[in-house]
Amino acid sequence: MEKQRSKKTKISDDLITCSGNSVQIPFDLIPEILKRLPVKTLARFLSVSKEYTSIIRNRDFMKSYLINSSTRPQSLIFTIAGGGIHCFFSLIDQGESTSSSKPTYLMNCPHLQLKTFAPSVHGLICHGPPSTLIVSSPRLIVSNPSTRRSIILPKIDANHECIYHHMGYDPIDGDYKVLCMMKGMHVYQRRYLAKELQVFTLRKGNSWRMVEDFPPHCLCHEDTPDLCINGVLYYVAMLDTASNHAVMSFDVRSEKFDLIKGGPDGDLNPKLTRYEGKPALLFPGSDYRINLWVIEDAAKHEWSKMSYDVSSTSLIRNPYFHHCVFCTNDAGEIVLAPDFVRTKTFVVLYYHPKKNTMRSVVIKGIRDRKIPLWDEASYHRIISVFSGQVDNLMFL
């Protein structure tokens, strides 16, 4: 009994002492050690002592942990639907050194009336009803795949209107804000004016707040993702009188809007992504072409336009012709994946535009999860693929 006691850890105001080995660690070094540990380990530490709990739940520590996590190699996060279940998987890209990989299962969301086209915003994902669904008082869910926990936001007074939603992060205050827009007057085809914009602050808010001043614009396709870079939320919009795509920017901290004009025209379904640190629109062209429009100067509405012919790459052959463009990764590669998965494996393609090379990675194991309805589905749909998934301690 005495031997067991000697191995216990004693925590004081200035030292942590491991008596059995006579090791003393200054208390101010403990946060530096803890923020290098995985989320699962920190979750177990919450039951060790009140001192550990106070450190891990401290807001400054959580912000520091997130910053430290963002410096590590970031993974792709897949949202895959099957049998009415949405499952989240992460995949760490090993580069050209690997030809196959098994993604890590994160969590599932068994909600039939939820759509997830939103990316991971500093580790959190916001999902809710599709914009085509009329709900009197819709509710959005914010999930943390790292902790496998979610919170339900307060009801939105939508007045029986369809809604669009986006989430951004303010790196200065460490606040997450969810932006919700009502679908207003029908303008043309699938275009509706945005009206009654509301904001919810994740840490502080108990209710939604109205945003009074915003430029008139039309909401775009519901499966067009948003993007948050350096405290600015971007989402694809359209001008009310033209066919040109535009990008709306929303400063998460100041809650100011700015419309970036000059995007591609036509009935496209572009993917908003990050390319070399800048927001960009990614969309397929004809004859095996991939188009990339990068916002070079938002204030001047300046874009650079690139088009890549991938027909010469050896991997653009059957059965990969049906792959869809999803996003870009940190290496500047364009990520392509199939819309539907009907077998135990599928292939993800990575196209490097500067090198004009294509590599493939065989993805295994997504059908191995024994989840009711999920493993019984005859096929699974890849709803979204995004880069930039990081570990986050919120909701731990």
From Swiss-Prot:
It holds the Pfam family F-box. Residues 19-65 form the F-box domain. InterPro entries: F-box-assoc_dom_typ3 (IPR013187), F-box-assoc_interact_dom (IPR017451), F-box-like_dom_sf (IPR036047), F-box_dom (IPR001810). This is F-box protein At2g21930.
